[in-house]
Amino acid sequence: MAKKKTSSSMARSQLAALLISLCFLSLASNAVGWSRRGEREEEDERRRHGGEGGRPYHLGEESFRHWTRTRHGRFSVLERFPDEQVVGAAVGGYRVAVLEAAPRAFLQPSHYDADEVFYVKEGEGVIVLLREGRRESFCVREGDAMVIPAGAIVYSANTHSSKWFRVVMLLNPVSTPGHFEEYFPVGGDRPESFFSAFSDDVLQAAFNTRREELEKVFERQREGGEITTAPEEQIRELSKSCSRGGGGGSGSEWEIKPSSLTGKSPYFSNNHGKLFELTGDECRHLKKLDLQIGLANITRGSMIAPNYNTRATKLAVVLQGSGYFEMACPHVSGGGSSERREREREHGRRREEEQGEEEHGERGEKARRYHKVRAQVREESVIVIPASHPATIVASEGESLAVVCFFVGANHDEKVFLAGRNSPLRQLDDPAKKLVFGGSAAREADRVLAAQPEQILLRGPHGRGSVSDM
């Protein structure tokens, strides 16, 4: 009887041990699952929000998606700006894109449902527009900027025998904000002709031609896709008719033509770099779109003085070199996990209420807090600087930095530089200085504000240690 009890007791103990082990295994499995799911969610979040420090105001090259990619070139489009409420509605509908074409590459005719403003980063080419019943052919080269209206049928080619043709562009969709499409009249499988969507009866009536002949023309299978290569003699023929002005244009102020930023005198230059700009007064199409283009060549180890734009939001694309940018922002920090948790917690009205509680004190006064947004930048980094946000861009010690800037909302905009010889803070009158800084500190404030003898482009923060994302 004792043996039976002992045996029964041992069996119960073994069963209990087995159940406990299974519980621990289940908990461990769930923990691993939760951990992996959390890692996946964080990774997805990083991919959606640029993957680097400074988001949503900074997006790296990994945020571009290939629309077209062949051995003859690529067309890549930056993902939509991740947090439109923070970045601002001013640029939420715009898209940034990069085009690269190999030597003697040819781009098939197409049109966008978006206005296109582009800057030639490198190389040379020919761009042909079919619009308003005529053909316009333009020679473009490095440093040129140009506007192509939505709906214009465009084809182009790299006219150089050994250099790549590289273009940075800003697209302003006219149908759906933030979304645009490219339409090809002639194609096969890739790209497909948009005529393939129409019925045979409609096409035969429209072109007064039999279906078989239409298919041979508009749905002919071509090798190479949207970007192909062309024989040298055909490239030469395309180049013969192109001009710097509008071939066949009226010569009016509304004439479409390329304008060279680097071929004109910089609006500011010193030992620390050069700044160029193309305004709406010089290009009526830019004024119509409420845009402006700027180019900053910053000497290595130099910086742009902290500044802001009164009305325009700046979209800056790094063309060459490396460095970092800093910005004072009242909306979010430039950080990572805490920012993600905040976005996850705040939804709809609850988010507005929580933000209202953060922004106002016990007496209903707004608590003014500014966060530092900071990120390293390199080629194809994109920076968003909203209107009135003080910011600076610094070139690294090792190489100069070239940045093209698209200013959205540029009509009636002004640039305000906060440090240096042209700082408006130097214009404070004496009574105001005593009230702002305190009577005893007014003279010290004068010394601080007058200590920088240069303006706009300045010597950078040398010897301050390495820069890292924060």
Curated annotation (Swiss-Prot):
GO terms for molecular function: IgE binding; metal ion binding; metallopeptidase activity; nutrient reservoir activity. Its EC number is 3.4.-.-. Keywords: Allergen, Glycoprotein, Hydrolase, Metal-binding, Metalloprotease, Protease, Secreted, Seed storage protein, Signal, Storage protein, Zinc. Glycans are attached at N297. One of its GO terms (cellular component) is extracellular region. Residues 36-52, 338-367 have a biased composition (Basic and acidic residues). Residues 1-34 form the signal peptide. It is an enzyme of class 3 (hydrolase). Residues 36-59, 240-261, 330-368 are annotated as: Disordered. Zn(2+) binds at H347, E352, H360. Seed storage protein. Globulin-like protein that acts as a zinc metalloprotease. May play a role as an initiating endopeptidase in germinating seeds. Homotrimer. PANTHER family: CUPINCIN, OS03G0336100 PROTEIN-RELATED. This is Cupincin. The lineage of its organism: Eukaryota, Viridiplantae, Streptophyta, Embryophyta, Tracheophyta.
